[in-house]
Amino acid sequence: MEYRICNGIGYLRLDRGDGVIASVLEFCRREGIRSATFSGLGGCDLAEVKTFDPETKTYGSRTLSGMLELASLWGNVTGDGNCGLAQHTHAVFAYVENGKHETAGGHLGEARVLITAEIEVRPVVGGVISRKTDPAWGTKVWDFGDR
C-alpha cells in the first residue's frame, strides 16, 4: 500500500496481495484516524462476501475467487468501544462465470488485491463515532452516546 493525503483526505493505492480492509485499517492507525468513511474500486482475486440472516442473527458467507472487478466499495471505520478500530464494509464484485457476466455483493469480510485498488478515505471532522451492540440483532451499530 502506498498513499497520499490531500486536504485531509487519504488516497490509497493497494497493490497485488494487499488486503482491502486490512489496508484501510492500517492507514487509519498510521494516521491516527478514529472515524472515517471510505469508497473505492479495483481488481481482486479473492473475496469473502456475507449476508445477514435476521432469523438466525448470523451471517452466511460466500467466497469468490478468480478475476473479480471490485465495482463498488463503501464502508466506514469507527471506534470499537475498546480503544481499537472497527469497520463496516459492503462491496459489489463483477466476474465472468461460464461465459456469463455475474455480480455478487454484500458485507465484505476481506478481499485480496490482484492488480490494484484505489481507495479514498474521508476522516470524520469534529468528532469520533464508535460502535455498540444492538441487543435486538446482536450486530454492531453506531453509538453516538453523549458525544
Which residues fall in each region the model found?
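N-terminal intrinsically disordered, cationic/polar leader segments
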Residues: 1-39, 45-88, 92-147
